[in-house]
Design a protein with these regions (language model features):
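Internal alpha-helical scaffold of NAD(P)-dependent oxidoreductase catalytic cores
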Residues: 92-110, 126-162, 173-175
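Phosphate/pyrophosphate- and phosphate-bearing ligand-binding catalytic cores of soluble enzymes
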Residues: 167
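Rossmann-like NAD(P)(H) cofactor-binding subdomain of soluble oxidoreductases
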Residues: 25, 44-56, 60-129
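Extended low-complexity acidic/polar segments
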Residues: 30-61, 131-142
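NAD(P)+-binding Rossmann beta1-loop-alpha1 motif at the extreme N-terminus of oxidoreductases
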Residues: 1-50, 124, 151
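Small-residue (G/A/S/T)-rich helix-start motifs and N-terminal tracts that mark the onset
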Residues: 1-2, 160-164
């Protein structure tokens, strides 16, 4: 929710460009009250099929289940996967994305791991970003998106744990 709210407040996307999925009607209704122009659905597959950038913002224990649900419609040559799940490494994400699939072994997903903080919805986040199998253009795009929501810093994956600790508690120090 916080990422979608921040993106809708920025200049790069309109709420009508953003599809939000959730399991519960209650969560979707909360998003509708925030902005009635969000595209809201329970259907992760349909949302992923039509997306250029897929942000997986769920609890870490749900990541594999969500990826298993959507991976049959993913196009690794065109889509960017962004994970907000703390502690879910690139190796794990890649395994989830490619296991038990007919994907060409040469196709590798473009994956970003990000760790924003709650200030993202008011466009004041410090977001740590790490990239795997991403071109310079893709990396620049993701950095640009999250710079609009505060500040974004590209870091090596090995630093994401420290970034997670800083992003999740650093805002308390600023207050």
């Amino acid at each position: 929710g916080a990422i979608a709210r921040g993106l809708a407040k920025g200049t790069m996307f309109k709420a009508s460009d953003i599809t939000c999925t959730a399991q519960s009607d209650e969560t979707l209704e909360k998003m509708r009250k925030i902005d009635p122009d969000f595209i809201l659905t329970h259907d992760n597959v349909e949302a992923a099929r039509n997306a250029d950038i897929i942000i997986i913002a769920v609890k870490p224990w749900r990541v594999e289940m969500i990826i298993d649900e959507i991976k049959s419609v993913l196009d690794f040559e065109k889509q960017i996967i962004v994970s907000v799940a703390a502690g879910v490494t690139f190796d794990l994400l890649n395994t989830y994305l490619t296991k038990n699939t007919d994907f060409d072994c040469l196709a590798t997903p473009t994956i970003f791991r990000i760790m924003p903080n709650t200030a993202i919805e008011v466009m004041s986040s410090m977001t740590f970003v790490s990239a795997r199998n991403a071109s310079k253009e893709q990396t620049d795009l993701i950095i640009h998106i999250f710079n609009e929501l505060g500040n974004a810093m590209l870091v090596e994956e090995r630093l994401m744990g420290a970034g997670t600790a800083l992003a999740s508690s650093g805002i308390a120090f600023a207050l």
